């Protein structure tokens, strides 16, 4: 699997007069078609990293390669078309008077012919389940609906990568799961690469890989299963301890020790059934 994004030795600070770097010698890669989660405490450098990838910020030094091209001042607008970004607060992204207008906005700026534009808008709204709201004012939508429209606007541009910058953090648990399912379906349909900045365990669990950032550096890269196996140490990374890990600890405290390796809910259920049959 080829790398769609490669980050080499990034250094960045918001104030050139400061000695402290927000990002210090950050390197990693993102494979084409994978779902990569980036986690860490507030101030760890997660959002700064993806803003550098999207060209919203400029690194002091280092290299960002997107789809085989190094990101520079000359090609930042060209490469930005390969990336769709959805932020925490969708209200900050709305520019159209209606949902349909808002999704079409980026396509108009790109000079997409009217017929193709209407087709893309309809397809994108259908994908996120918002077709019936296309004439609605964005301000009258719920938080989850607004995020769906923001995602539709990104998908309509046909990017290769979608970056979710804590896009589910303001939603209730049900809305969060619905949005994650939507992103998952879109990813499969278009073979999109997803980069997710998140604190949500359900999002992390869907990832192929997880990068942990700490104090502006990459602390570790692992699979979700390996990460969840860190148990109570996850709290220091800004995550909750997974339900299955907490349940296994409770069971062990009551005399039913089934090991310390992290198990998914399905794996734990199967393990408990096996133990039950042996009793």
UniProtKB/Swiss-Prot annotation:
Sorted alphabetically, the keyword list is: ATP-binding, Cell membrane, Membrane, Nucleotide-binding, Translocase, Transport
Q: What are the GO MF terms of this UniProt record? A: ATP binding; ATP hydrolysis activity; ATPase-coupled transmembrane transporter activity
Leading EC class: translocase
Q: Give its E.C. classification number.
A: 7.-.-.-
Q: How is this protein situated with respect to the membrane?
A: Peripheral membrane protein
The UniProt record gives the binding positions of ATP as 40-47
- One GO cellular component from the entry? ATP-binding cassette (ABC) transporter complex
Annotated compartments: Cell membrane
The ABC transporter domain sits at 5-240
Domain of life where this protein originates: Bacteria
Please name the NCBIfam families in this protein's record.
ECF_ATPase_1, PRK13635.1, PRK13648.1
Q: What does this protein do?
A: ATP-binding (A) component of a common energy-coupling factor (ECF) ABC-transporter complex. Unlike classic ABC transporters this ECF transporter provides the energy necessary to transport a number of different substrates.
Assembly, in brief, is: Forms a stable energy-coupling factor (ECF) transporter complex composed of 2 membrane-embedded substrate-binding proteins (S component), 2 ATP-binding proteins (A component) and 2 transmembrane proteins (T component).
In the record, the note on similarity to other proteins reads: Belongs to the ABC transporter superfamily. Energy-coupling factor EcfA family.
Q: What is this protein called?
A: Energy-coupling factor transporter ATP-binding protein EcfA1
Q: Taxonomically, what lineage is the organism?
A: Bacteria, Bacillati, Bacillota, Bacilli, Lactobacillales
């Amino acid at each position: 699997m080829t790398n769609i994004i490669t980050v080499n030795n990034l250094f960045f600070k918001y104030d050139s007069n400061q000695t402290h770097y927000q990002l210090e010698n950050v390197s990693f890669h993102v494979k084409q078609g994978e779902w990569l989660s980036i986690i860490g405490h507030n101030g760890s450098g997660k959002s700064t990293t993806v803003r550098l990838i999207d060209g919203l910020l400029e690194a002091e030094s280092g290299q960002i390669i997107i789809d085989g091209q190094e990101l520079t001042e000359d090609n930042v607008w060209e490469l930005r078309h390969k990336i769709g970004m959805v932020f925490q607060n969708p209200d900050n992204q709305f520019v159209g008077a209606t949902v349909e207008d808002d999704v079409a906005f980026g396509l108009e700026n790109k000079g997409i012919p009217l017929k193709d534009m209407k087709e893309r808008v309809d397809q994108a709204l259908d994908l996120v389940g918002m077709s019936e709201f296309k004439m609605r004012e964005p301000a009258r939508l719920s938080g989850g609906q607004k995020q769906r429209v923001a995602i539709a606007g990104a998908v309509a541009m046909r990017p290769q990568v979608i970056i979710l910058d804590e896009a589910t953090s303001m939603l209730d648990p049900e809305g969060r799961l619905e949005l994650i399912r939507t992103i998952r379906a879109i990813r499969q349909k278009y073979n999109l690469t997803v980069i997710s900045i998140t604190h949500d365990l359900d999002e992390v669990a869907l990832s192929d890989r997880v990068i942990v950032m700490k104090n502006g550096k990459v602390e570790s890269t692992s699979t979700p299963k390996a990460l969840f196996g860190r148990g109570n140490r996850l709290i220091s990374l800004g995550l909750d301890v997974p339900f299955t890990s907490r349940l296994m600890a409770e069971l062990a405290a009551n005399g039913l020790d089934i090991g310390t390796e992290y198990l998914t809910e399905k794996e734990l259920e199967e393990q408990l059934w096996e133990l039950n049959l042996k009793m």
